[in-house]
Design a protein with these regions (language model features):
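Flexible glycine-/small-residue-enriched beta->alpha junction loops
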Residues: 60-113
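Active-site-proximal alpha-helical scaffold in enzymes
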Residues: 37-67, 114-143
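Conserved catalytic cysteine-centered active-site region
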Residues: 5-59, 100-108, 172-189
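Flexible glycine/proline-enriched surface loops and loop-helix/loop-strand junctions
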Residues: 93-94, 115, 186-189
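Short glycine-/small-residue-rich flexible loop motifs, especially phosphate/cofactor-binding loops
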Residues: 18, 111, 136
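Membrane-embedded alpha-helical segments and adjacent helix-loop junctions characteristic
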Residues: 1-3
Length: 189
């Protein structure tokens, strides 16, 4: 089990991947490793998992992530930091001088990229729509079958269930539905 997790503090500290193994029904002998690579931690964990299988080192590897970069430090005693005068992450004098008036988050970064490359809301909706279409077509054509290990468990209602597909793909995505989604910030893309 390889999980990405930026700034491991609070509930996600102490090697979250190992804790996930110990919290599961896996044998204690299953290793768990956490990767901290800032915004790319979860993606890196998945790459490491793929490489382990491709190299023949491992037969089955679970790769994933638990980070929410915009909320770092998750679980930290933020109030204590405020009381000590530390403020928010990225709240240094150098950052304030370099980027006056900007509050950093993933959403701010996305808006800056969209602005730099003149991407409109419509451009991004079209990209998202096509991405879901491609993923849905690949799923229906069974392209992902060799990459997904079916996992059994209980769903939210407590009924036994088998997860055999990526649940993030929206098979019913449409441009109208995407256009109806609110932006994270007023006037954003």
């Amino acid at each position: 089990v390889i999980f990405g997790c930026v700034d491991q503090v609070g509930a996600q500290s102490g090697n979250i991947a190992r804790n996930a193994v110990l919290s599961s029904s896996f044998p204690e002998s299953v290793p768990g490793t956490s990767v901290d690579r800032q915004c790319g931690s979860s993606q890196q964990a998945i790459h490491f998992a793929i490489q382990a299988v491709m190299s023949g080192t491992q037969d089955i590897v679970i790769g994933g992530g638990v980070e929410v970069m915009s909320m770092v430090p998750i679980g930290a005693a933020v109030k204590d930091g405020f009381d000590a005068g530390h403020g928010l992450p990225f709240d240094s004098e150098g950052m304030k001088q370099r980027y006056p008036g900007i509050f950093f988050s993933q959403f701010t970064g996305a808006e800056l990229v969209a602005d730099k490359w003149n991407l409109t809301r419509e451009d991004l909706d079209q990209f998202a729509f096509e991405s879901h279409q491609k993923a849905a077509n690949a799923t229906e054509s069974k392209f992902f079958d060799r990459e997904i290990l079916p996992v059994s468990g209980k769903n939210a209602e407590g009924v036994e269930d088998m997860v055999m597909a990526d649940e993030g793909i929206r098979f019913d995505a449409s441009l109208d539905k995407l256009a109806g989604l609110k932006t994270v910030v007023e006037g954003g893309v």
